[in-house]
Amino acid sequence: MYPIVLYALHVAVLIFWVRLWSAPAREFYFNPFLSGTIRLTDSIFAFLRPVLFMPERAAALFLLLFVLVFKTVVAWRFGDEWLIRIGQGFVFAPPPAKHHAVSLFLFSALQTAVFILRLWTVYLLVRLITPPARTSRAGEALAFFVRPFSYLPFLLQPFVLLALHGALAVVLVHVCVLKRSVMPDAQGSLNPFLTGPLFAQALKMGWLAVLSFTDGLMFLTRGLFVLIIASFGAALLHARGAVIICSEGVELLLGRFARRGGTGMGLDFTPLIFFFVVDLLYSSIGRILIQLIHTPLLN
């Protein structure tokens, strides 16, 4: 399956997931980042209401599960690789199971959960680098799409996020199968998380959780890259509305490093500099964590 199709299905699941935590009848969205999504989901519910005979949240849950099943079937039909990548060193696959279809569905759901978890991580990273008093339509939209995580108090969010990444690490290590890992010693164990004493295994899973957390940096740079390319494309097509939306998105991801009020003063290379710095930071942290996981003392 092409990555763009996979991401589109992830986004479809995300839209119905967020709808479980929102009440459009009691909320008003005067925001170009949100109004289109809300109108689309409202149209879907209006079309299916005579068929489903369900309350809106129950219908959203039903459609969420339907998209997950559809994603699983499409990925299986087109021979997609059933993998979850953590950092640049670890690739996990679904475990062999008697009921293969159920196993693939659960792993497909886990893939989407990882997508949502990384989006939550991006939200926290953006909040950390953004001045508290700064608000924007893009920031409001991002907070909407990470519900219910954005409902939590800011001081509690890092701990909840680390706990979720820790739970993900435990599931990947003890339920899924590690297919490949970047190992300094080719003679070592295929799965370094199951070697050594218990305290060493727990420590290495903790580092895997931190490595999963740093994947938020990768997600941040990917989002920034897409917005930069989309902004250039919109400018070439003279689509002023799309240019404004992309510019606000770039400004959101740059946080306090964005140039405000600097338009019209020549080319701004801040997004590209930010992209390369964050990508370098992500690669450096990833290499350090991989070396710690493969430390001979703990294996």
Regions found by a protein language model. Give the residues of each.
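Selective transmembrane helix interface/packing segments
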Residues: 1-299
